[in-house]
């Protein structure tokens, strides 16, 4: 899959939402889920395509999930924000990824609090 293929998939999803056909096509009701999947897939595809150059240059490309963050945008969607991080707290893990030693096992993965979150069972993204 290429970034163009993913872009078309996400455009098709957006069209299905607008037309009211998304549920009938098997998409989840909550639009946050497909949008986050699209974001992570884009990073994984980009990381796959850039791996050789990134490794030579000492770059780490990962998708980061900070977890629940207490922001004005998230409050309307969650009734219990007691476990949410502040934006500053959420930024700590991102800064550590940026400034710390590179863990090549994290390359192209979804990372939360310094740990890889399995996307699915280990699977290669097809070209």
Question: For each predicted feature, which ranges?
Answer:
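Catalytic loop of short-chain dehydrogenase/reductase
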Residues: 1-56, 65
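Short helix-terminating capping/connector loops at secondary-structure junctions
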Residues: 54-58, 103-105
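Short beta-loop-alpha junction of Rossmann-like oxidoreductase domains
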Residues: 53-54, 68-78
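A short C-terminal helix-loop "cap" of Rossmann-like NAD(P)-dependent dehydrogenase/epimerase domains
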Residues: 16-23, 68-72, 88-92
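C-terminal helical subdomain
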Residues: 63, 71, 78-127
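Low-complexity, compositionally biased segments
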Residues: 8-10, 73, 96
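A general structural-boundary detector
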Residues: 26-29, 61, 76-78
């Amino acid at each position: 899959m290429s970034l163009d293929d993913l872009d078309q998939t996400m455009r098709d999803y957006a069209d299905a939402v607008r037309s009211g056909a998304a549920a009938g096509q098997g998409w989840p009701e909550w639009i946050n889920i497909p949008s986050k999947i699209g974001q992570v897939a884009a990073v994984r595809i980009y990381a796959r395509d850039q791996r050789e150059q990134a490794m030579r240059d000492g770059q780490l490309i990962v998708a980061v999930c900070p977890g629940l963050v207490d922001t004005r945008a998230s409050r309307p969607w969650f009734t219990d924000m007691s476990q949410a991080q502040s934006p500053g707290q959420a930024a700590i893990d991102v800064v550590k990824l940026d400034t710390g030693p590179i863990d090549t096992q994290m390359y192209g993965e979804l990372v939360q609090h310094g740990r890889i979150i399995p996307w699915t069972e280990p699977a290669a993204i097809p070209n």
